[in-house]
Amino acid sequence: MHIPDNYLSPTTCAVLAVAAAPVVGLSITKVKAQLKENKELAPMLGIAASLSFLLMMFNVPVPGGTTAHAVGGVLLSILIGPYAASLALSVALLLQALLFGDGGILALGANIFNMAIAMPFVGYSVYNFFRKQNHETSGVLVGSYVGINVAAFLTAVELGIQPIIATQGGEPLYNPYGLAVTIPAMMVTHLTIAGAVEVFFTYVIYRFVKQVGPQELYTPTSVNTASFVKKIRYVLIVLVVLSPLGLLAEGTAFGEWSSEELAEMMTNVPAGIENGFSFEALFSDYTIPGTNIAVGYILSAITALLIFYILGKMIRTMNGAKVSHA
């Protein structure tokens, strides 16, 4: 679901970045207000970004030789609220693009709009509706399923309208596949396998939190994190250790191909993709020079967690928080 650079036109990227910016700005404002009431939310933002980052490393195979992954957007909304979740997801997507080349730099606004805005807010609204009817578990299941599929549908539409932008000869400049291809390709995968994976991770982690500390779940009036940070660390450790399992799924997710991969699939690569913006991430595809793939995957995960931890500490320090961690 991470759209690479040059698959969307610069105009599309700009429009989606402009659409995402005010929501991210509002999320920052809301989180600042929450931090004034509860300083312990600061480390939780880093934990939430880490959790989503790790979930997105678990690729699963899908028919057609491609892969898919969970995002954790609705899960984070349930744990720390939709605004904090949106901010944490945005930071995770930014780090993925800059450091690991997962998702484009120019397409960052689109990826934030799909995965860090539409998914957590829509999914949380569904969850909250069921919660108010005393069907919280159903809300977790349905909300996470709806959330990831809304994000997938938006991605499919954004990619599918790109063939409109073409050369005088009618050759697409950017993503070459129209809506008749992108919507079925994305939605069949996410309505079945990816949706099930998202629901599974969301439910398992939700049940873990519910059992060890039900008071830690977010409510519109409070977000309790004092003991949550300690408990969720165990989940992060397990996910880091298991992260190389994401390498078992071969192939690239639909719409996330590099120009080289696309060249193997098509006779003519669109000019906008072949000659477009190029950015070489330091640890592209979660590989570390001099290490084997599995070790590189684990080290990439640890690197991300350390960065998110430092960011959490910085936010806490800037807000004058003095939180003691056992």
What would you call each of these model-derived segments?
Residues 1, 280-315:
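Individual transmembrane alpha-helix segments
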Residues 1-13, 36-40, 65-67, 106-110, ...:
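Interfacial loop-to-helix junctions that mark the boundaries of transmembrane helices
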Residues 2-10, 14-15, 19-76:
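Hydrophobic transmembrane alpha-helices
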Residues 56-119:
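Alpha-helical membrane segments and adjacent membrane-interface helices in multi-pass membrane proteins
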Residues 115-156:
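Short helix-perturbing small/polar motifs within transmembrane alpha-helices
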Residues 144, 160-231:
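Glycine-rich ThDP/TPP pyrophosphate-binding loop and its adjacent helix/strand module
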Residues 150-172, 251-283:
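Juxtamembrane non-transmembrane "cap" segments at the membrane-aqueous interface
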Residues 200-271:
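Internal helical hairpin/lid segments
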